[in-house]
């Protein structure tokens, strides 16, 4: 009988069951939401060819000559009739200018704009977006980076088709890191994919709160209407040209999520770990400015992970100790241990399935062991970068350099 158990074990069991139910709810409603969206969109007909508004692709670049030479031909060969590509060159000192001149000669839809190195009153990335918006000839702006490659020639079509709905002002697209074999690279790949599931899942299930500038589309009219040219509220901060902009303009009814694999963008940043660390640190700083409701979802998910796994393992250990060391009939111990193990296995299986099915929905190679191995570690990574960003918050001000 349960009455034979100490009160602290009973309390631990109650905490375990409640936390497990919360985790189950979050897995089904948030973490699996992107996968269901991708499957639903895959079954929908192709983009309506009658809706093909002009699009301006804004490509931010800083000393990325090699990446531009590799990725610009892909951007300039999209299956879309009316678009232009504008490279925003942030004071590059490598062979970027040579690459840009060559591309200007090859394509009449290619343009470039150089960010003045003397600018100190505004983040160069935000200034680049502002210059790109002013230089663009179309109302639909599609942001990406020089080191990012679209997965297909239909990338623009997939991202832009959502603007057929006049209420849609922002479209969020999926981003993954290029697959590499080293341990650190795979860790970075898993972390970004994990955050992608949470970001898009929370956007679909709760409310939008951020986005990635590697794959982000929005209306130019929305950009200019947002607090005087898009960045007024956080003008003095270096980061925020993508996530804080989305946080400012996004509502539940004006944001669409594109999850088709043809709309995927692969980030080929090198060295990957440094790029990942800088991006993580930047998000650790800007996340404090996100909306409250998504933050509650994120914290609840992190806390209930520990309140599920640790009490569950404690119950298994306690009942196993009783079976081995205490004389008598242990039917209750076996029952409690079986229930605890079953619930833990169900959660683990659901965790692995979510990552596996989501990766397959985006035509990515699944990482089956990483969700289990890093289940309790990833919230600590998040806390680490948030604390580090808080301690170095002055470095995120305009005019400061060096984030790490």
Where are these predicted regions, by residue range?
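Catalytic donor/gating beta->alpha subdomain of glycosyltransferases that bind UDP-sugars
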Residues: 163-195, 224, 228-298
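Long helical/loop segments within the catalytic core of UDP-sugar-dependent glycosyltransferases
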Residues: 111-124, 128, 158-233, 284, ...
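Short aromatic/hydrophobic "clamp" motif used to bind/position activated sugar donors
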Residues: 141
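Short, well-formed alpha-helical segments that are part of the catalytic scaffolds
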Residues: 42, 64-77
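Acidic donor-binding segment of Leloir-type glycosyltransferases
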Residues: 72-118
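Membrane-embedded multi-pass helical conduit in multi-pass membrane proteins
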Residues: 33-36, 305-395
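N-terminal membrane-anchoring/stem segments of glycan-assembly enzymes
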Residues: 1-48, 382
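Cell-envelope/extracellular polymer assembly enzymes that use nucleotide-activated donors
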Residues: 53-56, 84
